[in-house]
Amino acid sequence: MELEKEMKYWKWTKQIRRISGILLLMLSVCALSRQTAFAEENQEVVDIPGLVYDHSMELVYAEEFSVDYYKEGYALIRIHQGEETFLVVPEGKEVPDNLDSNITVLQQPINHIYLVATSAMDLFRAIDGIDSIRLSGTKEDGWYIPEAKEAMENGAMLYAGKYSAPDYEEILSEQCDLAIESTMIYHNPEVKEKLEQLGIPVLVERSSYESHPLGRTEWMKLYAVLLGKEEAAETAFEEQAEKLEALSSEENTGKTVAFFYINSTGAVNVRKSHDYVSKMIELAGGVYVPEDAGSDDNALSTMNMQMEEFYAKAKNADYLIYNSAIDGELESID
């Protein structure tokens, strides 16, 4: 069958690995020239009793968070236009009186983090902050980042359960001072509520909602605020900016690329055309297909297609990249 022959072609070649390498490089690239004055344009400065506003963090691409700095080292983090708000209090400083009940206090040092949002680990690595992560929501064999695997091997980082089933006893015994979750936690709101009842602040990171891949990378600046590593984050950001500048002179190859996986129902899950993966392909000099994927306005970054429709739109793609990170590798066409 022609379909079977085409599916066999999906066993990736050296060319696939080459373009995948380019895409991985783009994951860590973080700068161009566009400025996003998120805090200044979209939100007013919060008046906190006893604190004096100083300045706001300058962000290049990230649109899902903002940081306002106050005198004496205080910092206010707002996520998703203030849906979640955190006040980072420097070590040795007092929590302001009469603080709004919607503001969660994060007292530095923050060095017993329960990291459930796996995508954040590489950003912590970039700012030399993995030592501040005591608990992991991913087992040792699930990490591809050497520093994370090593930390779990030597006991510096412990497994404390996945997002839907955390080990509360372990989390409490390790004096966890912050849980960083992905938006998957909203599927189990009782877990977030329980952690907060136990006195553990929960920060839900939304880097996956950034429309530009560089916006995702810029979340390292938020984590740097937690750890007091802003200079390290700025340095890492600038280093990646130089890499992008070198790549920006490359001409568009015109090569078409499909990025997908087959879900448990047999449907093909693809990235929408506005998603960060689609943007990475564009930045790497390619053209994402299907080009018309996801013209609707909902916030989801992926969509499902029937196999026949996907085949019709992607059969002539120059490169087919299978996303095995979700449901594993494709072993057969059955």
Model region roles, listed by residue range:
Residues 1-15:
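N-terminal secretory signal peptides that target proteins for export/translocation
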Residues 249-333:
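Flexible, glycine-rich surface segments
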